A protein has these predicted regions:
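Metal-dependent phosphoester-hydrolase catalytic domains
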Residues: 177-185, 193-194, 223-224, 252-258, ...
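Active-site metal-binding loops of divalent metal-dependent hydrolases
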Residues: 57, 98-99, 176, 238, ...
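N-terminal, active-site-proximal structural segment of metallo-dependent hydrolase catalytic domains
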Residues: 7, 21-170, 200-212, 227-231, ...
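Active-site His/acidic residue clusters
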Residues: 231-252
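Short, structured patches in soluble enzyme cores that scaffold and shape functional sites
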Residues: 185-187, 224-226, 235-238
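N-terminal export and membrane-targeting signals
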Residues: 1-14
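Conserved hydrophobic/aromatic beta-strand scaffold that supports enzyme active sites
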Residues: 54, 170-172, 219-223, 235, ...
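A substrate-binding/cap region within the structured catalytic cores of diverse enzymes
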Residues: 155-196, 216-218
């Protein structure tokens, strides 16, 4: 990823495309046995569990307001393809990364009403009565020269890289009520306030270091009421560990953005330093149920990540890693070659189709990680092998949807009524 320019990433993201369908390892790879494509499938799942998904949908644009214009009518092809992927997998709750923030939730409602609620290519519409959007740090001017180029302004000097405020934002859609009065956001949490942080000591000025925000977008704790129980959707989209220099400022930030959730879910002293945007301190109380979702831009073994970054969640004692796989990822890795040939992570676990030669190759960067007190039922990655149903929604650059796959997990909510 270090070999891509920021310009290339912005333009590619506007086109991008998704991937495949699978089952929990070590079950046989293929189309997930409960990847619902109809309301009947959802009714069946109601008896067994809750499906939570994450999808970097690449619904970002290079100009402020363009996404809202694209979604205001039902004929944007990329949006139709994204909606079809969601309809095929029919999650009860889904986080979309790289969905430009528009104040008032207008873009979120437009995508829901004009695309998700409309049958795409014969698939049953999905109804999401509830959604959550909030401001993010991308594109918000910092007033500081954060890239040390001698000038103040531009995407690299924003609190999170972005051409305009809200670019690369997030939205959560839910079939179940969101407890809005209990939502916590951490957009303004300062990086230096994390004990033992990896903030570069020889790159930022003291003035800059004192003001830097940790989240490149934001961190959200969104409680969802499932029957009489609550499941916390912990959503984020850490910065890519690339596009920097030997100081590794983005790799270090990515590591600490991931660590934030690892500390937050402990429910112990290690979370006392945390404060939210309303000033409330502390992490998630022990015993609470959660699913960590998002594009974390970190593979546990490959790519440019700071050593051990993803392992902070994958090896966490409170987290269950379902290790979802897909057949499409295996085929893509073998056919594309390049950096994929030397990867340590099994190709079946990949969730994103990145440049292969010279680097970084396809990676596992998108996660849906439930707490261990949510019994795991199934999980998958929507990346069908060529010729399988849905494979027309995937492909190589320019992608019909996104360069990331939708990742889902089915969990049982104990005592749900």
């Amino acid at each position: 990823m270090r070999l891509r320019s920021r310009t290339a990433v912005v333009s590619a993201a506007a086109l991008a495309g998704v991937l495949a369908v699978t089952t929990v390892a070590p079950a046989a790879a293929g189309e997930g046995p409960r990847a619902a494509s109809s309301s009947k499938g959802h009714e069946s799942r109601d008896k067994h569990g809750l499906r939570v998904a994450t999808y970097n949908a690449s619904l970002n644009r290079g100009e402020q307001g363009q996404l809202l214009r694209d979604l205001s009518t039902p004929d944007n092809q990329q949006a139709r393809n994204i909606a079809q992927v969601i309809q095929i997998n029919d999650p009860d709750i889904v986080l979309l990364n790289e969905f430009d923030y528009v104040p008032g939730g207008r873009a979120a409602r437009a995508f829901r009403d004009n695309y998700l609620a409309v049958s795409q290519n014969g698939h049953a519409p999905v109804d999401y009565p509830y959604h959550y959007v909030a401001p993010v740090n991308t594109g918000v001017p910092s007033g500081l020269d954060l890239n040390q180029d001698g000038t103040v302004g531009g995407p690299d000097d924003a609190w999170g890289f972005g051409l305009f405020p809200g670019q690369y934002g997030m939205v959560i859609y839910s079939k179940y009520p969101i407890a809005r009065d209990r939502v916590r956001t951490f957009q303004h949490f300062r990086w230096q306030d994390m004990p033992g942080n990896r903030l570069p000591t020889d790159y930022y000025t003291p003035e800059q270091a004192a003001q830097l925000r940790l989240s490149s977008k934001s961190h959200w704790d969104v409680p969802v009421r499932v029957g009489h129980k609550t499941v916390h959707v912990l959503a984020a989209h850490p910065t890519p560990p690339s596009f920097d220099g030997p100081e590794d400022r983005n790799g270090r930030r990515n590591n600490d953005e991931i660590r934030f959730w690892a500390d937050y879910i402990t429910g112990t002293k290690s979370a006392r330093y945390i404060y939210d945007d309303a000033g409330r301190r502390g992490g998630l109380p022990r015993g609470e149920r959660f699913v960590i979702v998002g594009d974390y831009n970190s593979d546990p073994n490959d790519g440019d990540s700071f050593p051990g970054a993803a392992r902070q969640l994958l090896d966490n004692s409170r987290v269950h890693d379902p290790q979802p796989t897909s057949t499409g990822a295996v085929v893509a890795s073998a056919r594309q070659g390049g950096a994929n040939r030397t990867h340590v992570t099994r190709p079946a676990l990949d969730t994103a189709d990145f440049s292969d030669d010279p680097a970084p190759g396809n990676l596992r960067v998108d996660y849906a990680l439930p707490s261990k007190n949510l019994p795991l039922l199934d999980a998958g990655v929507f990346w069908p092998a060529p010729g399988r149903p849905g494979s027309e929604l995937t492909g190589e650059y320019p992608f019909p949807t996104s360069d990331h796959s939708l990742v889902w997990v089915d969990v049982k909510v104990p005592g749900r009524r």
